[in-house]
């Protein structure tokens, strides 16, 4: 016997369905469910008196014969490819299926089998996303990794050796010895990790040594001398070994101007860090490279979005991070040349146009690694408020804008760094690196972080309490973050040369090495999903005004942001 219930009652019980809309945190961003893979009247739900019981929603099928290890029920999946309601199956640490779960012996349309060996994560009323990828990490301290993980980031790529002055300023791990020691340390951390070697050299030998020693990318940084010769040599080595190059160009224009750097690229693919320029790069016009077909541009989060406080906080940050002395006039001039309200305002709009493709942190080096996700959505909200709906969206929802912005910290850095076959989206066949959110806390405080199919972190109440919820509630590492479960649930990204050689054996590591691939001529700006715009960008050298295809890009700084003090005491 069937019965009819209201949409609100249905949503309370099983989560939103097709046509229902959900607000993301306290922003003005609204998503609308595009499709529901579940079957009305046959939904599965766990709990006392609920559906997933033996002989009902749970079948007799063994895991060996096809039952899932874990099913996330009735979640709203938000990803670059769509916004849908579905059950999501995890098997052997991978995303096995996105569809309708249940017992095929008694239920129709079942493509995910729940058996006695299946665990359940309740996704009703929740949003499910891919784990975030922060591709601009200064590995200054190991405590960073837990902070990033608790924010929903499950993959980190960068360079450094700890709190050395080279690491404070540059995302480079210099030399094979340091690279090897850093990779050995990675066995302690429950996230995917990759090392960028120092790319500043005019001859190839030292760079080849680092790539073969385990680096998955090379980083050119002005503090080590990003000259045209170093750029050309680094890109040549990268082409030979299929690794990505990231660049922080010459702020002082000592060895050339932005045109000279572009010439040194020779049309080759390169990932441009903090493309606006406050984080470093040719002053005042490095932002021009965001319009080039071979440049994969990203932002770092301290300039995201442009607010009334952005300019004031940057000067002190820069002096500390780049070992500058405020009593030296030249050091002060160097710092002031990098901080321009005009280019920071333009950065907001270029993100909204899809001309800036990725978001990252610049952790502890003019960036906050726990705020990559928050600041992405704050930027999206600011642009919705100031620019209205995108042409691709309707008055009902912001689905396209949401897909554009989520791609900036999930699939696009995964493509840029050659790991999109493994991570970066909620798609079958990929590692189950997933984050579950309550809509009211979306992008701010996750409900649950899943790493390769195992819960690795979550908010947890007093361990001595009679139930899991009593205060104090803290984010805590879970069983997936301990022992051999940790090393079995995450990987180290390396070059193909390193993965194919004896590196893992020589270093004695437990984590698997995963080789990056297809990061050179096989990708370009057009590979950046929903973020592939290539406008002609011009910067006035006197006023710093930025134009894209002749249109002035300017916006007011935000006075108030969402996802801020409503959620945090400090």
UniProtKB/Swiss-Prot annotation:
A cellular component term, taken from the record's GO annotations: cytoplasm
Biological process annotations from GO: urea catabolic process
Pathways involved: Nitrogen metabolism; urea degradation; CO(2) and NH(3) from urea (urease route): step 1/1
Modified residue annotations for N6-carboxylysine: 219
Name listed for the protein in its UniProt record: Urease subunit alpha
Cofactor: Ni cation
Enzyme active site: 322 (proton donor)
Catalytic reaction(s) noted: urea + 2 H2O + H(+) = hydrogencarbonate + 2 NH4(+)
Domain Urease: 131-570
């Amino acid at each position: 016997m069937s019965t009819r219930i209201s949409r609100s009652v249905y949503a309370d019980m099983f989560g939103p369905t097709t046509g229902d809309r959900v607000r993301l945190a306290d922003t003005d961003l609204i998503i609308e469910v595009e499709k529901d893979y579940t079957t009305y009247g046959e939904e599965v739900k766990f709990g006392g008196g609920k559906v997933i019981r033996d002989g009902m929603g749970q079948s007799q099928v063994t895991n060996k014969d096809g039952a899932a290890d874990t099913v996330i029920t009735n979640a709203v999946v938000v990803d670059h490819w769509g916004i849908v309601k579905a059950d999501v199956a995890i098997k052997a640490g991978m995303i096995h299926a996105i569809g309708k779960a249940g017992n095929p012996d008694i239920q129709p349309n079942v493509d995910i089998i729940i058996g006695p060996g299946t665990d359940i994560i309740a996704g009703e009323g929740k949003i499910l996303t891919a784990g975030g990828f922060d591709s601009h990490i200064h590995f200054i301290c190991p405590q960073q990794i837990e902070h990033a993980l608790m924010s929903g980031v499950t993959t980190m790529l960068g360079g450094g050796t700890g709190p050395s002055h080279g690491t404070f300023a540059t995302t480079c791990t210099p030399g094979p010895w340091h690279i090897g020691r850093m990779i050995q340390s990675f066995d302690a951390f429950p996230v995917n990790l990759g090392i960028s070697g120092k790319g500043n050299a005019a001859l190839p030998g030292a760079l080849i040594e680092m790539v073969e020693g385990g680096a998955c990318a090379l980083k050119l940084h002005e503090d080590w001398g990003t000259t045209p010769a170093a750029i050309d040599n680094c890109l040549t080595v990268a082409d030979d070994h299929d690794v990505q190059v990231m660049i922080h160009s010459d702020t002082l224009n000592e060895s050339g101007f932005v045109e000279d750097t572009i010439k040194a690229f020779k049309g080759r693919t390169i990932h441009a860090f903090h493309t606006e320029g406050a984080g470093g790069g040719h002053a005042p016009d490095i932002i021009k490279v965001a319009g080039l077909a071979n440049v994969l541009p990203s932002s770092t989060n301290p300039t995201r979005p442009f607010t009334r406080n952005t300019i004031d906080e940057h000067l002190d940050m820069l002096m500390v991070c780049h070992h500058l002395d405020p009593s030296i006039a030249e050091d002060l001039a160097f710092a002031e040349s990098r901080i321009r309200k005009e280019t920071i305002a333009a950065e907001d709009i270029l993100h909204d146009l899809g001309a800036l493709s990725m978001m990252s942190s610049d952790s502890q080096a003019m960036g906050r690694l726990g705020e990559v996700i928050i600041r992405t959505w704050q930027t999206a909200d600011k642009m919705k408020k100031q620019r209205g709906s995108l042409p691709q969206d309707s008055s009902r929802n912001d689905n396209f804008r949401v897909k554009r912005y989520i791609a900036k910290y999930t699939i696009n850095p995964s493509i840029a760094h050659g790991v999109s076959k493994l991570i970066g989206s909620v798609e079958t066949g990929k590692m189950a690196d997933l984050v579950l959110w309550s809509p009211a806390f979306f992008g701010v405080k996750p409900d649950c972080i899943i790493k390769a199919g195992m819960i690795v972190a979550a908010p947890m109440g007093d361990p001595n309490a009679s139930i899991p919820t009593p205060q104090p509630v803290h984010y805590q590492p879970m069983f997936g973050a301990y022992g051999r479960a940790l090393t079995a649930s995450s990987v180290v990204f390396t070059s193909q040369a390193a993965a194919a050689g004896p590196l893992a054996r020589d270093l004695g590591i437990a984590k698997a090495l995963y080789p990056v691939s297809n990061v050179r001529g096989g990708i370009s700006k057009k590979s950046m999903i929903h973020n592939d715009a290539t406008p002609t960008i011009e910067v006035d050298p006197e006023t710093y005004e930025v134009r894209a295809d002749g249109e002035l890009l300017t916006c007011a700084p935000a006075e108030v942001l969402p996802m801020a003090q409503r959620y945090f005491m400090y």
